[in-house]
Amino acid sequence: MSERILTINPGSTSTKIGIFDGTEQVFTKTLRHSAEAVGGPLSDQLNIRRQVVLDVLAQEQIDLKALTAIVGRGGLLRPLVSGTYRVNQEMREDLLNGTFGIHASNLGGLLADEIGQTLSIPAFIVDPVVVDELEPIARLTGLPELERKSIFHALNQKAVAKRYAKENGIPYEQLRLIVAHMGGGITVGAHLNGRVIDVNNGLDGEGAFSPERSGSLPVGQLVELCYSTKYKLEEMKRLVVGSGGLVAHLGTYDAVEIERRIDDGDEKAALLYEAMAYRVAKEIAAQSAVLYGQVDAVILTGGLAYSDRLTKAIEERIAHIGSIIRIPGEDELRALAEGVIRVLRQEEQVKEYGGELTWLENSTSLS
């Protein structure tokens, strides 16, 4: 069976596309968009981006009729169990209407579906950020009004975990892993028998601080800051995600620039970089407790995993937990293609949005 797949990953100002023959990437391109093109509602952006994608594919003389399937990055949807989902009408409406939030990634499934319909081939999404496999115990907090949510780098965390499993000849569903994705945001997940049973919410201010996110903060001081009239609601949210972390302290979220400053003797930059590594190590150690200390491997991934300085600082604090594997970067296009390939090869069953299990129905034992 043919396995020629178009992958689409929309960002805030660009759209990355790729063509895969099975697991081999044969084409990739990043399409940049003007501020006007991405400044309107999702419905307007959908039309503009779709035409840009089709124009580029035509210019590259890519035969769309040879495609088997199309897959887009998953957006903000209702909480889902991990897997590859067919884009259906209910998903389309939730993405387009922003039912669970508006984000550029919502366009991934929409673009895949629109192009797929014209070619009469299926459209999918794979492991969106709202993948939710938390155990009931992991949801509880000290206030009944507040429940922890699962929002993390599900696509890359799942992809590297399954890649590790395949390379070692062990089913992912039989492994106990800790995966730390380190990029603009940082999420650390405990993977038990194929499910992420605990992970910090990388969007709403949990866990380690990162280049542009605050991470967990002292609650009392945060409450006082919220009521100080110094900041409005949207400004506070921006401090937590977008303007927090390293950029708040150093004025840049560029890790290469920060390491250059450290090499030049910047003690403040050195301390903050070490502090970020310290916080990541604490998150990893916490997730090892979730797994009762029985950890097959710790995987460091994401763009920051390219940094020898950062990973060494983390590894020095967690070497006792288990073997440490570095899989740097976040090849999202490949991860999307791999999700579809597993369905085409019947290694996994495609899931239907709207028919997924709730977290209570999907819970399992930690032991």
From Swiss-Prot:
It is an enzyme of class 2 (transferase). Gene3D superfamilies: 3.30.420.40. It is found in: Cytoplasm. It catalyses: butanoate + ATP = butanoyl phosphate + ADP. GO terms for cellular component: cytoplasm. GO terms for biological process: acetate metabolic process. CDD domains: ASKHA_NBD_BK. Keywords: ATP-binding, Cytoplasm, Kinase, Nucleotide-binding, Transferase. Its EC number is 2.7.2.7. The keyword Nuclease does not apply. Pfam families: Acetate_kinase (PF00871). Its main location: cytoplasm. GO terms for molecular function: acetate kinase activity; ATP binding; butyrate kinase activity. Belongs to the acetokinase family. This is Probable butyrate kinase.
